[in-house]
């Protein structure tokens, strides 16, 4: 019916009683040409017809007198000659038809049920990733861009860390737990609570190169009474080779007071259904990080300040930025000849916009093998500790120093 109404605005339909031969006065004339007017018989008296056709409503002529002669009233009420302009469609009818079409389409759209039927069918329509493994694992692919590689044509450690952070946030979003778009559940939002990372461990088996496509799988699990663990596996999309393993521990902080908080029961009820009962993909490195200061450090870089773009929506420096600052004090000869293969960071406090920091690095004498190990400290000028860390390095194009944990600790087969 909508299509008929729309088409009738462009092409008026003929009346059912239309005839091709000349008929009595009131029937549709056989020709509308104003160049050849015809006369109409009426009781033996012939009167030349006006060039204009009788007015019509719904295809039937109306408003004519029973006699063939026109009265003075008829002469004044006769319509103007039919021209190209006055034979255009009725735009009000056309507008009404278009409006009807759009309203019908909108109604059909709203009636569709877009809710996923199964947890493993949760898919982001914008291509940000998908939920797999019975709704417990989030998967997303990334292509390595030219601006994400370093001098050796491989992805930087910052690129890897950005992929970890992006998938963590998208996981919360696609699972329907994000209230403000940045990792907070509705109950967390009500209580001004945010997630902050307490510890991060990363093991890199191989860095992808420009043009490679990597697949990132991530999931969450319980960590103690008031913590949450998030694990990642990064693999090569073409070969399935595991490139990177990462594990982290997160705790809650009140956004207004900037103090750590216990997980409220309401928040726990939101997140626990998404927990995976699985050990971490990396064995926890519980070695105590030694104290580092000016006397014990081999290299110190001072005067580091955050830029505006280094802040996240929680108004503190993004945790990925800390890695770049830590590497600022790493010896240049190490950066040129070796690559980072293992990273452990312990976050002590947040860093704000006005902070001025110092980066301290010392060689770890306990490190063995053919690579290097370093202790790191990122602190404020007044001595307050921001991040403590340990890094392990291997010769470039070499293999990782030590055994990479097998996939037995992952929650399932992700193929």
Swiss-Prot record:
Compartments in which it is found: Plastid, Chloroplast
Transit peptide: 1-60
InterPro entries with a match to the protein in the record: Acyl-ACP-thioesterase_N (IPR021113), Acyl-ACP_TE_C (IPR049427), Acyl-ACP_thioesterase_NHD (IPR002864), FATA/B (IPR045023), HotDog_dom_sf (IPR029069)
Top EC class of this enzyme: hydrolase
Residue numbers annotated as active site: 314, 316, 351
Gene Ontology molecular function, alphabetical: acyl carrier activity; fatty acyl-[ACP] hydrolase activity
Record keywords: Chloroplast, Fatty acid biosynthesis, Fatty acid metabolism, Hydrolase, Lipid biosynthesis, Lipid metabolism, Plastid, Transit peptide
Listed GO CC annotations: chloroplast
Catalytic activity: hexadecanoyl-[ACP] + H2O = hexadecanoate + holo-[ACP] + H(+)
Low complexity: bias regions: 1-16, 24-41
Keyword tRNA-binding: no
Transmembrane segments annotated in the record for this chain: none
Enzyme Commission number(s) of this protein: 3.1.2.-
PANTHER family found in the cross-reference section: OLEOYL-ACYL CARRIER PROTEIN THIOESTERASE 1, CHLOROPLASTIC (PTHR31727), PALMITOYL-ACYL CARRIER PROTEIN THIOESTERASE, CHLOROPLASTIC (PTHR31727:SF2)
Stated family: Belongs to the acyl-ACP thioesterase family.
Annotated function: Plays an essential role in chain termination during de novo fatty acid synthesis. High thioesterase activity for palmitoyl-ACP versus other acyl-ACPs.
The protein's name: Palmitoyl-acyl carrier protein thioesterase, chloroplastic
Species assigned in the record: Cuphea hookeriana
